[in-house]
Amino acid sequence: MIKYYNRKNKDYDIEKVAGEKYLNWTYSSPIGMNLLEAFIKKKFFSKIYGFYCDRRLSRKKINKFINDFEIDMSLSENQLSDLTCFNDFFTRKLKKEARPIKADKNLLISPGDGKILAYENLNLNSVTEVKGINYSFYELINNDSLAKEYDNGTCLVLRLCPTDYHRFHFIDNGICENTIKLKGFYYSVNPIALSKIPSVFCKNKREYSIFYSENFGDIIFMEVGATCVGSIIQTYKPNTKILKGDEKGYFKFGGSTVILFFKENTIKIDNDILNQSKLGYETSVIMGEPIGSRK
């Protein structure tokens, strides 16, 4: 059971988890863990499932998924009849009015839909992942000199579960460098899995780029792959002018994570998100929703 904080009703909700029985069995049973290490965490497994989700045969999954998780398709740019495979549905674009972007340059917005955790006063040797499990920021980005620039900074971890809108966006005007890709495995990023496998973010396939934002300093913008994520697709053009709310990229099928790192004294995260993070609870947000402000 995954409990998260709902900002709208100021109370806790229980997340509906896609494939919850499978996740619990895989990460809690000896047989499941053996299969995980031998096969499921490997690129080959995610590639096979990604291949299936790109084929017309997978289209039959769409209606059941929409009904089971109460997905509002009226927000989608595409009609259901336009979708030829499950990944068409999973990577669907939303209408602009579905995720309005506030122009106020002082407002920090969420880069995507999902559940967010926030950590201030970043300790590079011990970044909290979930349930008190820590990892090294140095290990995460594999660049010691760059990591040192973010000492005492702020970290945002946005978890996109399979039921979420799976495109991620820029949070400010600016310019973004080329993407750096780091090889890794494909463990799940669901809290069920994170509590069983230490330092998942450092072990999984991930990509990051430096985003030179106009109002929030130089931001490390990282995407972490997960089980059954066929691909991390970057759609932005490096080293060109970017506007707040522009799409950066998207994940193909699977739960995934976006992590942002800010330098010291650049942003202030909203108190409700910070307080819930300290209690160990994620907060539900949508792309474009204000989550903080410029210092």
Curated annotation (Swiss-Prot):
<comment type="similarity">
    <text>Belongs to the phosphatidylserine decarboxylase family. PSD-B subfamily. Prokaryotic type II sub-subfamily.</text>
</comment>
<comment type="function">
    <text>Catalyzes the formation of phosphatidylethanolamine (PtdEtn) from phosphatidylserine (PtdSer).</text>
</comment>
<feature type="active site" description="Charge relay system; for autoendoproteolytic cleavage activity">
    <location>
        <position position="169"/>
    </location>
</feature>
<dbReference type="GO" id="GO:0004609">
    <property type="term" value="F:phosphatidylserine decarboxylase activity"/>
</dbReference>
<keyword id="KW-0594">Phospholipid biosynthesis</keyword>
<protein>
    <recommendedName>
        <fullName>Phosphatidylserine decarboxylase proenzyme</fullName>
        <ecNumber>4.1.1.65</ecNumber>
    </recommendedName>
</protein>
<dbReference type="GO" id="GO:0006646">
    <property type="term" value="P:phosphatidylethanolamine biosynthetic process"/>
</dbReference>
<feature type="modified residue" description="Pyruvic acid (Ser); by autocatalysis">
    <location>
        <position position="256"/>
    </location>
</feature>
<feature type="active site" description="Charge relay system; for autoendoproteolytic cleavage activity">
    <location>
        <position position="113"/>
    </location>
</feature>
<dbReference type="InterPro" id="IPR003817">
    <property type="entry name" value="PS_Dcarbxylase"/>
</dbReference>
<keyword id="KW-0456">Lyase</keyword>
<keyword id="KW-1003">Cell membrane</keyword>
<dbReference type="GO" id="GO:0005886">
    <property type="term" value="C:plasma membrane"/>
</dbReference>
<feature type="active site" description="Charge relay system; for autoendoproteolytic cleavage activity">
    <location>
        <position position="256"/>
    </location>
</feature>
<keyword id="KW-0443">Lipid metabolism</keyword>
<keyword id="KW-0444">Lipid biosynthesis</keyword>
<keyword id="KW-0210">Decarboxylase</keyword>
<keyword id="KW-0472">Membrane</keyword>
<dbReference type="Pfam" id="PF02666">
    <property type="entry name" value="PS_Dcarbxylase"/>
</dbReference>
<keyword id="KW-1208">Phospholipid metabolism</keyword>
<dbReference type="InterPro" id="IPR033177">
    <property type="entry name" value="PSD-B"/>
</dbReference>
<dbReference type="InterPro" id="IPR033179">
    <property type="entry name" value="PSD_type2_pro"/>
</dbReference>
<feature type="active site" description="Schiff-base intermediate with substrate; via pyruvic acid; for decarboxylase activity">
    <location>
        <position position="256"/>
    </location>
</feature>
<comment type="pathway">
    <text>Phospholipid metabolism; phosphatidylethanolamine biosynthesis; phosphatidylethanolamine from CDP-diacylglycerol: step 2/2.</text>
</comment>
<keyword id="KW-0865">Zymogen</keyword>
<feature type="site" description="Cleavage (non-hydrolytic); by autocatalysis">
    <location>
        <begin position="255"/>
        <end position="256"/>
    </location>
</feature>
<keyword id="KW-0670">Pyruvate</keyword>
<comment type="subunit">
    <text>Heterodimer of a large membrane-associated beta subunit and a small pyruvoyl-containing alpha subunit.</text>
</comment>
